[in-house]
């Protein structure tokens, strides 16, 4: 998912973890419930602390670092929003470090469809004690509504492909060639949900654990835009619920007393801060005001690694890369794309700019993803380092080759090459990375690059409209399978590189077609239909097509760095895709 950062906020304001007003206004009818303590899990109840925004010692304070555009499970695309959703909603299952475990569902069965194709029909039995935060029962109809909502043409969700590519009838509904009733998700009764897949999918339960598949109540979503961030309207079914939201400041998540597993939830709640300045974030932690933050200054990483036992750094299933707009002039030439890619010293970026243990990348799929054999898709040396692939040397620039490709494109030594705009958004080390790329391309290729930075809301609109040439982009896995990365570039995937061989209803303005995408799509389709080593072959084939066409320019595989104050908090950490799961956290000490 996109790692999104929206707003930079004044350090002085953010350091004072002070009281702020809730989003409901004094004259808002929803505010009439603010003092109601009869139902301790009532949405809109902001009496959780002595003053709005203040928290007691039983609240964990966590710097989210980002203010997501949405907390709506079917609309959100960011890890920031995903972290909120994972803690206020409960899907049918959860993906944990120990594997898939039951959540709102207490059991499931897998069977054949009417044509006799095995492993295509999943039947989930829901817990009868699962409740929404307002006390209503969670039913199979809530999941049916949510999953059909995710693929509805009216919602036009960016993540519709996570449903369209797997559930029978969903793609047709989304494209307008079918109806809502054609989507093969059905509540057989209040506590039984049945879904039929297009073909067997080995990782379907991993998909179901993702936030796009979380439940949503029709009467809640139909209240209009903005319900997901309004504490008076946002009704959820997870271990916590949204008690308070202050733009530019924080969210308060309060323990949901109607949660089916509430007895094992030890926190009174979580305060999530929107501090995007890494120095301010670290200062808050070192002052004892923040227990968890991953927003850390790159220059401080060596010190933290050497001195702070609360600091951890571990590989994650993500990639930072340059996305080429395959329909844009200049970079629609593969020689230009290869020249730009080979002229980059990735090791220098990792060692001197990031300094956080990030791994130079030579392809799309991170080393942590495994094939059916347990092996990585990456070529690794005897020390576990990524090796050269697709002509990309992860340990240095291939300057001579890069210049040859640029000359083949008609720009020897960069002569006549137009000024190139490099777009990025405000986040962490993005500016330093952009400046390093600008310098490398000038020194190694003789071309001029103009840096263009936007705050995230503007950036998202720019990318969605296709109004860019190249951009620094990042993606973290939505589920623990190589397809989580590879499916992005299918004709019906998110595909912000706009590399499609056929038009797609989800991006109606992307009408410039790229025929070389078809063999990629063919391999993706076959990888979806097959299992084991046969599937492994198609996954590799798809990545080969993508990288041989240099649709993206890999920079580095992401690393998860954070500090967790173990003198104040105890907990198991993150899910396999890097989401914080606070259900089992406990505050210790004072």
Q: How does the language model describe each region?
A:
Residues 107-162, 287, 330-332:
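Aromatic- and charge-enriched surface segment that lines or borders ligand/interaction sites
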Residues 343-375, 428-438, 463-590:
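Detector for C-terminal structural segments
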Residues 243-254, 271-328, 351-353:
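Extracellular/periplasmic solute-recognition and catalytic clefts
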Residues 63-115, 235:
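N-terminal lobe/hinge region of extracytoplasmic solute-binding protein
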Residues 20-29:
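Bacterial lipoprotein signal-peptidase II cleavage site
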Residues 98, 172, 180-182, 190-191, ...:
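Gly/Pro-rich hinge or "lid" segments in bacterial periplasmic/extracellular proteins
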Residues 61, 139-146, 190-196, 238-239, ...:
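Alpha-helical secondary-structure segments
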Residues 254, 332-439, 443, 541, ...:
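Append "and occasionally in soluble cytosolic enzymes with long acidic Gly/Pro-rich linkers
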């Amino acid at each position: 998912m996109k790692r999104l950062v929206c707003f930079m906020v004044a350090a002085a304001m953010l350091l004072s973890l002070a009281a702020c007003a809730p989003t409901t206004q004094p004259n808002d009818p929803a505010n009439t419930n603010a003092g109601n303590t009869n139902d301790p899990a009532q949405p809109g109840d902001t009496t959780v602390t002595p003053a709005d925004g203040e928290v007691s010692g039983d609240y964990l304070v966590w710097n989210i670092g980002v203010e997501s555009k949405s907390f709506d499970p079917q609309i959100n695309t960011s890890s920031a929003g995903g972290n909120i959703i994972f803690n206020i909603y409960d899907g049918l299952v959860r993906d944990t470090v120990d594997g898939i475990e039951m959540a709102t569902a207490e059991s499931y069965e897998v069977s054949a469809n009417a044509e006799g194709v095995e492993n295509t029909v999943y039947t989930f039995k829901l817990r009868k004690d699962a409740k929404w935060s307002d006390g209503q029962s969670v039913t199979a109809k809530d999941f049916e509504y949510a999953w059909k909502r995710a693929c509805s043409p009216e919602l036009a969700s960016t993540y519709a492909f996570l449903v369209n590519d797997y559930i029978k009838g969903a793609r047709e509904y989304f494209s307008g060639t079918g109806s809502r009733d054609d989507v093969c998700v059905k509540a057989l009764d209040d506590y039984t949900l049945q879904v039929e897949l297009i073909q067997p999918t080995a990782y379907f339960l991993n998909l179901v654990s993702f936030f796009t598949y979380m439940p949503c109540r029709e009467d809640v979503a139909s209240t209009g835009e903005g319900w997901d961030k309004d504490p008076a309207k946002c009704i959820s079914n997870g271990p916590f619920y949204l008690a308070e939201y202050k733009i530019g400041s924080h969210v308060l998540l309060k323990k949901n007393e109607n949660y089916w597993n509430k007895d094992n939830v030890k926190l009174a709640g979580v305060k999530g801060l929107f501090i995007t300045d890494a120095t301010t974030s670290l200062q808050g932690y070192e002052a004892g005001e923040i227990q968890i933050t991953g927003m850390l200054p790159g220059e401080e990483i060596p010190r933290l690694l050497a001195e702070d036992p609360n600091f951890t750094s571990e590989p994650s299933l993500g990639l930072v890369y340059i996305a080429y707009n395959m329909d844009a002039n200049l970079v629609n030439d593969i020689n230009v794309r290869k020249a730009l890619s080979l002229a980059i010293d990735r090791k220098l970026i990792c060692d001197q700019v990031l300094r956080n243990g990030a791994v130079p990348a030579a392809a799309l799929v991170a080393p942590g993803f495994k094939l059916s054999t347990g092996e990585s898709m990456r070529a690794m040396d005897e020390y576990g380092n990524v090796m050269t692939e697709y002509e990309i040397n992860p340990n240095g620039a291939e300057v001579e080759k890069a210049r040859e490709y640029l000359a083949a494109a008609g720009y020897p030594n960069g002569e006549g090459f137009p000024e190139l705009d490099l777009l990025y958004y405000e986040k962490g080390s993005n500016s330093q990375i952009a400046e390093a790329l600008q310098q490398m391309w000038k020194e190694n290729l003789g071309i001029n690059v103009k840096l263009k930075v936007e705050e995230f809301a503007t950036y998202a609109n720019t990318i969605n409209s296709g109004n860019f040439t190249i951009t620094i982009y990042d993606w973290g896995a939505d589920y623990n399978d190589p397809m989580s990365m590879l499916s992005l570039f299918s004709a019906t995937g998110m595909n912000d590189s706009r590399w499609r061989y056929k038009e797609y209803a989800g991006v109606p303005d992307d009408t410039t077609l790229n025929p070389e995408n078809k063999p990629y799509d063919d391999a993706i389709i076959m990888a979806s239909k097959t299992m084991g080593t046969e599937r492994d072959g198609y996954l590799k084939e798809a990545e080969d097509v993508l990288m041989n066409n240099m649709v993206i320019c890999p920079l580095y595989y992401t690393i998860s760095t954070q500090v967790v104050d173990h003198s104040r908090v105890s907990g198991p950490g993150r899910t396999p895709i890097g989401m914080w799961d606070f259900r089992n956290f406990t505050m210790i000490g004072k």
